[in-house]
């Protein structure tokens, strides 16, 4: 379920009739009447492998997050209307069956897709009665996505329902799951003890702008800058380098290896938090590393070493497309700096690369209304667009905004 959600990052970026977001349809087809959706469904069928009350049966719940992103890139409101009932029903099932009395959510190592990360003792296949920070943060994010969908579809009661849950959940997360000594969000046991590890799972909290109080945001993000924490030579490790279980030599799965889709997730969170320069720097580091390894091995890999150049162990070639599905939007959004919001007919371009050479993008899809080319040097942006847009340019601490009609134009930055 989680990997399929990440594959949909390509939705809106690949021209043609195939829509990556439709990969999620097989999960909706397998949905139980209760609202439960299995995490494992075979391609081409609605056959599911897990039973609902198996602790490992579902998650991570990223479906609404992926659907809303696809909507912002394509403007396909009809799809939101079609999938919203399934998304709302699954959220309610998770709220009824994956929470503790205080409203915090649980998962397992397996269901979280950080399978061998020892953040919760003996938690690979069982929740151990802990509250898990990624499941809680994803639930907050899910509430935001569902509220936006409900408002779009004029479903006021359901918008209020998820907004009320979110307010309560944010309060409890910040009361219980913030480790003030470390300035970090962590899993919490039934006795109130924090996990002994700093996991990349905590950075799901960045994806919702309402979750982290302002006074906690900068120290929480600082861990992504500290070389003894998450700022290893190649970014970002799934465990901080100062965690006891961190494995610098092999990566050992989720005990320190770098997974491109999780690095991209953190960059998306930094974008929400408006820490754009850091997201850009992390993207440059990561894309360069993946490119160098691809040059030497002629392969994309599921995960990479954090302190040496090469694939991490277990050494597994990426055959699902998960790594390119992270790298392509990472290049477009955080290296080149493009952000498309098609319902608003708007493109933001944060120009962070050196303008000494011409750079930009060709054939960037504009929903279903054609494509756009945006190429620039230091002084001029060359534009060819099939549809009128609003273009907002962030350049050298200056912001330019202009309405661009369909056609070909040169825009001076002098």
Language-model segments: which ranges?
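Charge-dense, low-complexity intrinsically disordered segments
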Residues: 14, 81, 126-133, 153-156, ...
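Solvent-exposed, well-ordered amphipathic alpha-helical segments
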Residues: 20, 64, 147, 160-171, ...
């Amino acid at each position: 379920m989680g990997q399929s959600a990440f594959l949909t990052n390509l939705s809106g970026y690949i021209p043609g009739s195939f829509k990556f977001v439709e990969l999620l349809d097989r999960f909706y087809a397998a949905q139980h009447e209760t609202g439960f959706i299995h995490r494992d469904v075979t391609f081409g069928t609605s056959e599911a492998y897990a039973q609902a009350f198996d602790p490992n049966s579902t998650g991570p719940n990223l479906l609404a997050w992926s659907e809303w992103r696809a909507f912002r890139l394509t403007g396909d409101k009809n799809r939101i209307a079609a999938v919203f009932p399934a998304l709302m029903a699954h959220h309610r099932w998770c709220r009824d069956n994956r929470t503790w009395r205080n409203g915090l959510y649980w998962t397992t190592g397996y269901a979280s897709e950080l399978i061998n990360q020892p953040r919760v003792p003996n938690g690979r296949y069982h929740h151990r009665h802990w509250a898990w920070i990624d499941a809680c943060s994803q639930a907050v994010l899910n509430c935001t996505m569902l509220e936006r969908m409900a408002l779009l579809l004029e479903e006021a009661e359901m918008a209020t329902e998820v907004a009320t849950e979110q307010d309560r959940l944010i309060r409890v997360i910040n009361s219980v799951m913030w480790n003030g000594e470390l300035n970090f969000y962590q899993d919490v046991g039934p006795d109130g003890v924090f996990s002994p590890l700093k996991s990349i799972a905590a950075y799901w909290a960045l994806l919702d702008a309402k979750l982290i109080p302002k006074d906690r945001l900068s120290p929480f993000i600082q861990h992504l800058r500290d070389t003894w924490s998450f700022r290893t030579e190649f970014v970002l490790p799934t465990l901080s380098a100062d965690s006891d279980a961190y494995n610098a030599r092999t990566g050992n799965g989720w005990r320190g290896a770098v997974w491109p889709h999780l690095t991209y997730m953190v960059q998306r969170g930094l974008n929400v938090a408006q820490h754009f320069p850091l997201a850009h720097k992390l993207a440059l580091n990561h894309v360069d590393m993946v490119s160098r390894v691809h040059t030497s091995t002629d392969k994309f890999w599921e995960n990479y070493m954090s302190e040496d150049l090469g694939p991490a162990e277990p050494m597994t070639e990426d055959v699902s497309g998960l790594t390119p599905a992270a790298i392509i939007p990472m290049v477009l959004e955080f290296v080149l700096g493009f952000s498309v919001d098609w319902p608003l007919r708007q493109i933001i371009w944060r120009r962070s690369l050196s303008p000494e050479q011409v750079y930009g993008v060709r054939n960037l899809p504009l929903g279903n209304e054609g494509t756009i080319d945006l190429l620039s040097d230091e002084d001029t942006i060359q534009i060819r667009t099939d549809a009128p847009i609003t273009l907002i340019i962030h350049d050298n601490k200056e912001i330019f905004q202009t309405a661009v009609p369909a056609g070909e134009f040169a825009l001076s930055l002098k």
